[in-house]
Structure formats: structure tokens, C-alpha cells
Amino acid sequence: MAGAQRVYKQRIRSTQTLKKMFRAMELIAASRITRAREHARAAAPYSRALTRAVSAVATHTQIDHPLTTDRADTNRVAMLVVTADRGQAGAYNTTILREAERLAAQLIEEGKEPQLYVTGRRGVGYYTFRHREIVKSWTGGSDNPEVSTAEEIADTLLEAFRAPVAEGGVSEIHLVYTRFASMVSQEPRVVRMLPLEVVEGVVEAGGDVLPLYEFEPSPEAVLDALLPRYIRSRVFNALLQASASELAARQRAMHTATENAEDLIRKYTRLANTARQAEITQEISEIVSGADAMAAS
């Protein structure tokens, strides 16, 4: 019985240590998520404005631009998968990787060849463990993305889209990320960025239709200037949305882990008390038996 009591006390101490760690991670995520949400909210108007500007060019002109035209000379397709650098975020990474696998299976079924571009150590580890080739990866700072990283990612994807077939050019660019809906809801999203599909931010509910523009020096020159910025803003916005989603998922997961640790501590405390009571009962029984034996002799 004494051995069982020691085991339960050791488990209580270990669980208390884990509880402190879970609680600290919950508080850290809670302190960072406010800033992450503000950054995502602040970046949204710029992304919408660029979408509207690009939409105006694509809608009111009849041009054959490489970034808006389907490419038929290759079946390679780029997939940018946005994951986290760390775990302890519930099903956050699992959900987005499952969505990426679904997209890859769909593309393969269509006769296309997915090319993986991955952000976050979790995604890199996932594909490396499965011996899946990654064209390029970016790690570090998934919970606090920087503009320079987004620009590097976007420029790499644009370079692949513009590259000839012999140099690994791709015909499409797809983005797989997690959209922050609320503190309790984060949604995996798949967006085809190139060739350009203007599917959001064109006309808001109750808003005005796109006005007519005259483009100087030409619509092609305007697209050349706008589309790289458009892709960079979409990538950066996706990184910000994923950052807020990661922190929200981590805060929720660590809160649940803290509560589970408290339940375990209560359980082990009861078991330790039961073992102690059994030990005391056994000692009393042995004393009484010894006294009876001495009295009988």
C-alpha cells in the first residue's frame, strides 16, 4: 500500500507540473491572439482593394495576359500548404493537412501533378516522413508572420508560374490555409490564386458595381504591376489568418488540457487517500493482532 501511495503522489506532482505548462501556454496564446486578429483585420482592406482593382482590369478589358490565362503546356500544379511550426494546437495541423491531401487527390484525379510548397515545421515533417518531395519550404514564425516572408513565398510561386516547362513551370497555383472565423471556429480553405479567379471582394452585398476605367499606359501594364502585389497580399493575408487560427486553436487546446490535468489531480488525490486509508487500516489491524497474540500468551 505504501508503494501505491508513493506512485500516486509522484503522478500528482508530474500532473501539477504539466498543468502549469499547459496554463502558461494558454496564457501566452491568449496574449498573442489579440494582436494576430488585429493584424489580420488590418490587412483585409488592402487585400480587398487589390482584388477590386484587379477585378476591374479583368472585367472591363479583353486581354490575353499570362497570369489570367489557362496554361496548357504542363500539368504541374503548385500547392502552397500553410501549417504551424509547433503542435499543442488540437486538430489544427491535422485538419489543414487533411484538406491538402484532399486537394492533391482531386488534382491527381484530374490528371495533374501537384508540386508541394509548404510553410511550417509540422507540414514539412508530415510530408518528409511520408517521403513526399517538397519543392520549397519555409519554417519559423508561423504564429507571427512577416511581410518579407510572404513576399518571398509569393515571388517564388510567381516565378514557378512564369517559368518554362523545362525549368519546372506550373500551370496553376493553389493555396491551402486556415481562415479565422472566430475564437471557436477556424475553417480550412482552398483558393486557386493563378490563373486569376476573381471570386471574392468584387461586389459586396448592397454595394456598387465595378466602375468603368481607362487604363494607362495599358491594361497589360496595369496587370503586370497589380497581379504580383495581389498575390503577395493574398499570401500575407493567408499567413495572418492562419496565425490567428493557430493561436486560437492552441488556446482552446491548452485550456482543455489544463482542465483535464485538474481532473487527473483530483482523481490521483482520491486514489492516494484511499491507499493511505488502506495502509492505516492494515497497520491498525496488525497492531491489534499483535496485541491479541501477546494477551493470549
Curated annotation (Swiss-Prot):
UniProt entry tagged with the keyword Metal-binding: no
Main location: membrane
Entries under Pfam families matching the protein: ATP-synt
GO molecular function, one term: proton-transporting ATP synthase activity, rotational mechanism
Xref: NCBIfam families: ATPsyn_F1gamma, PRK05621.1-2
HAMAP family: ATP_synth_gamma_bact
Keywords: ATP synthesis, Cell membrane, CF(1), Hydrogen ion transport, Ion transport, Membrane, Transport
Family affiliation: Belongs to the ATPase gamma chain family.
BP term (GO), one: proton motive force-driven plasma membrane ATP synthesis
Function: Produces ATP from ADP in the presence of a proton gradient across the membrane. The gamma chain is believed to be important in regulating ATPase activity and the flow of protons through the CF(0) complex.
Annotated PANTHER family: ATP SYNTHASE GAMMA CHAIN, ATP SYNTHASE SUBUNIT GAMMA, MITOCHONDRIAL
Quaternary structure, from the entry: F-type ATPases have 2 components, CF(1) - the catalytic core - and CF(0) - the membrane proton channel. CF(1) has five subunits: alpha(3), beta(3), gamma(1), delta(1), epsilon(1). CF(0) has three main subunits: a, b and c.
Compartments where located: Cell membrane
Entry's Gene Ontology cellular component terms: plasma membrane; proton-transporting ATP synthase complex
Topology in membrane: Peripheral membrane protein
InterPro entries noted in UniProt: ATP_synth_F1_ATPase_gsu, ATP_synth_F1_gsu, ATP_synth_F1_gsu_CS
Official protein name in the record: ATP synthase gamma chain
Gene3D superfamilies to which the protein is assigned, alphabetical: 3.40.1380.10, ATP synthase, gamma subunit, helix hairpin domain
